[in-house]
Amino acid sequence: MIIGLHGHSGVGKNAAARLLTKQGFTTFALTAPIRRTLLLLDPRLEQGWTLSSLVEEQGWTGALRHPLYGNEVRRLMVALGRGMRQDFGDNVLIDPIDRAIAAMSNGTQANIVVTDIRLPHEAEWVISRGGLIISIQRDGATPASEDVTERPLPPALVSFTITGT
């Protein structure tokens, strides 16, 4: 079973994934290659900070929510993700997870949760493997940016919606 989690930044996708992990699911994030690449590049932020120093101190969630640097960290992630998809194809972030699932399942059905389904083709990938998409919404949560990755998925791709406060 593959469960893909969809929703704005900060609505609780990672918290939901942690609950599923306690039930035997393995967690994957489509953004993992983006984050690894950005840490290798280690861009400079303002006031002597680098991305790696910010992430080391705050974690990725803290870096993305940081009052001074959060918008820039998000902009870097979005730009790199867009560039990777343009240069290497829409599946550039999906393929590593596909390979990992194939390696770990060994012919059996693995229980997988993907924490960051943002685009229709990502949701279609989950569904094509017999999975489902859960949209997580929270009162007052708004998109972190105007980027296409912050738009809701088409309703036909969403199996369930969880709404919290």
Model-derived regions, located:
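Hydrophobic anchor at the beta1->P-loop junction of P-loop NTPases
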Residues: 5, 114
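Hydrophobic positions on the alpha1 helix immediately C-terminal to the Walker A/P-loop
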Residues: 16
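Small-molecule kinase domains that catalyze NTP-dependent phosphoryl transfer to phosphate-bearing small molecules
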Residues: 6-9, 120-129, 135-165
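Post-Walker A helix-loop "phosphate-sensing" segment adjacent to the P-loop in P-loop NTPases
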Residues: 21-28, 43-46
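Short active-site oxyanion
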Residues: 23-26, 110-112, 132
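Conserved lysine of the Walker
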Residues: 13
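ATP-dependent small-molecule kinase phosphotransfer cores
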Residues: 32-109
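Extreme N-terminal starter segment of soluble prokaryotic enzymes
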Residues: 1-3
